[in-house]
Amino acid sequence: MEFWKLQGSGNDFVVIDDRDEKLESFLKERGVSKEDFVRKVCAFHTGVGADGLILIKNPDNPENDFKWEFFNSDGSVAEMCGNGSRCAVRFAYERGIVGNKVRFETLAGVIKAEVYENGRKVKVQLTPPSKPEEKTLTVDGEEVIGVFINTGVPHFVVPVEDVEKVNVIKLGRAIRFHEEFQPKGTNVNFVQPVSEDTIKVRTYERGVESETLACGTGATACAIVSYLKGLVKKKPVNVLTRSGEVLTIDFSEDLKEVFLTGSVYKVFEGRLSEEVLEY
C-alpha cells in the first residue's frame, strides 16, 4: 500500500489515497481494525511514525474535490486538523486530484484551500470558531486561567509570560483530562506574546497525548485569543511554533472568516509492508 509522509511546521502525517476504498477490505481480510492500523503505522520505531494519518476519499457532494478521514496517532478520529489539512491539500494537488483552489469535506465542515508555490505553501480557510469562553480551572490546587475556543477541534488557551518555563506535558495533560472538558477532553495551548503581531506557542495535543512541534488549529486559537485579549495589536498574527516554523493566521473582525497559511514539506514516498501489522 503506497503512502506519502508530509509535514507542516513539524506536524507530520501519513497520507494514503483511498478513493478506491481498498483499505477497508485489506484490513477486514486480516482482522485488523482501522484504529489498530492507524496506531501501528503512526508508531515510531515500529511503524512509519507520525502525529496522524489521513485517508483521501471520494466526496459525498460532487461539488467538493475530496473527503478526508483524519486520525490521531492513537487511532482516534478528529473532526479537524489545521496542519493536516494543508498536508492533505498538497498531496491531492501533486497527485492531480485538485487544482490550485480546493474544497474538501471534513467532520468539521467543508474546508476551502488555495495552493501556492507549486504546493510548497497552502492556505486553508477554517470553519468559523465557537465563541471564546474564559474559564478558571483548579489544577493540582492552583488556579489556571484561560480561554476555551473551538477552531474545528476544542482548544484551551493559557496566556503565560514565558512558554519555555511551562511543563507542557504535566500541566497540559492535567488540563486535557480536566473534568471541565469531559467527556471528549481538549487540546491545550500555552501562548506568549512576542511583539505586536507575533506570538510563541506550545501545544499539548489530544489524541497524540504529548507536546507536538506545531498544531494548526491550536495556532489559530492562540492567534484569535491573543488578538481579542489585546496581547497582540495587529493582524495577520505570526505564530512561532515549537519546530521553529512560522504559521500565519488572519481572520475577520467577526471571526466568520479564518485563514491558516504555512509551508508544507514532502518528506518521502513509501510502500507499507504487511509486516507493520504484526507489532
UniProtKB/Swiss-Prot annotation:
Belongs to the diaminopimelate epimerase family. GO terms for molecular function: diaminopimelate epimerase activity. PANTHER family: DIAMINOPIMELATE EPIMERASE, DIAMINOPIMELATE EPIMERASE, CHLOROPLASTIC. Pathway: Amino-acid biosynthesis; L-lysine biosynthesis via DAP pathway; DL-2,6-diaminopimelate from LL-2,6-diaminopimelate: step 1/1. The gene is dapF. Catalyzes the stereoinversion of LL-2,6-diaminopimelate (L,L-DAP) to meso-diaminopimelate (meso-DAP), a precursor of L-lysine and an essential component of the bacterial peptidoglycan. InterPro entries: DAP_epimerase_AS (IPR018510), DAP_epimerase_DapF (IPR001653). It is found in: Cytoplasm. It catalyses: (2S,6S)-2,6-diaminopimelate = meso-2,6-diaminopimelate. This is Diaminopimelate epimerase. Keywords: Amino-acid biosynthesis, Cytoplasm, Isomerase, Lysine biosynthesis. The record marks H155, E205 as: Could be important to modulate the pK values of the two catalytic cysteine residues. Its main location: cytoplasm. It is an enzyme of class 5 (isomerase). It comes from Aquifex aeolicus (strain VF5). SUPFAM superfamilies: Diaminopimelate epimerase-like (SSF54506). One of its GO terms (biological process) is lysine biosynthetic process via diaminopimelate.
